[in-house]
Amino acid sequence: MLKSYLSITKPGIIFGNLISVAAGFFLAAKSEPASLMLFLTTLAGVGLVIASGCVVNNIFDRDIDQKMARTQNRETVKGNINIDVAFVYALAMLLLGTALLFQLVNPLSAVVVLLGYVYYVFFYTMWYKRNSVYGTLVGSISGAVPPLVGYLAVTNFISLEAILLFTMFCLWQMPHSYAIAMFRMQDYREAGIPVLPVKDGIHKAHRHMKAYVVAFGAVSLGLFLLGEAGYEYLAVAAVVCLMWTKVTFRSIDESNYVVWSKSVFKVSLLVVMGISGVLGVELIPLAL
């Protein structure tokens, strides 16, 4: 039973998002005082709110999850979870996570994470994901909130650097998510989810992905140009962005787009891990 309730929080998604929270935190802590306790409290608060959002997503997506091979074995689909209990579970995590951030971090981080939550649950999950080709774009905005909250946990102020970080992660989400949609195209078709590759075809999606990858690379260099990240960051960012660009710009057709999209997806993970990791390695000694 405990395993079932843990699974609907999507631990993998939580872990991935907390890496970006850490990146935002250490980027801000380069020039602002921070502590290990503040760092751990931020991770706990954001992690609980993300877990709550994932549970609500599982609850509301039961009808489409049962149509997709990837999700048809989720506990909420199989009926192993009491939906009323799951709602209470999600609400408890949301309240606890927000309270931790509000009381022990700062009110701004709590407000921003709550706005991201509302955006994800009400705008993305309940409407845009199901009804609009722009669902991925809407989802990318909420997906870029965790690193922003990590940054705000330290600074308690939305600066140009914070906006740049938020923009970076918004741009990263788009080709990453389109790649998933392309190699799981049949699932999305059967569930009736109008993602760009399904609605407008793989070639239009490919053009969009190339544009987003180039934009991400340009924006990611902004942290170095602003003097907020050093040469180690520049080297890693340049390498992973060039790798992502090279893979994304390959020609595709109906015979190879699945293999290609899996490659784009894998490199996208390397990109976010590399950039988040180098920010941590470069800035941890200055932060804590």
UniProtKB/Swiss-Prot annotation:
Q: In which pathway does it act?
A: Porphyrin-containing compound metabolism; heme O biosynthesis; heme O from protoheme: step 1/1
Q: Where in the cell is it found?
A: Cell inner membrane
Membrane-spanning segments:
8-28, 36-56, 85-105, 108-128, 131-151, 152-172, 211-231, 233-252, 267-287
Q: Which residues form a coiled coil?
A: none
Per UniProt, the keywords (alphabetical) are: Cell inner membrane, Cell membrane, Heme biosynthesis, Membrane, Transferase, Transmembrane, Transmembrane helix
Matching NCBIfam families:
cyoE_ctaB, PRK04375.1-1
Biological role: Converts heme B (protoheme IX) to heme O by substitution of the vinyl group on carbon 2 of heme B porphyrin ring with a hydroxyethyl farnesyl side group.
Q: What else is on record for this protein?
A: Carbon 2 of the heme B porphyrin ring is defined according to the Fischer nomenclature.
| UniProt name for this protein | Protoheme IX farnesyltransferase 2
Q: Which gene encodes it?
A: cyoE2
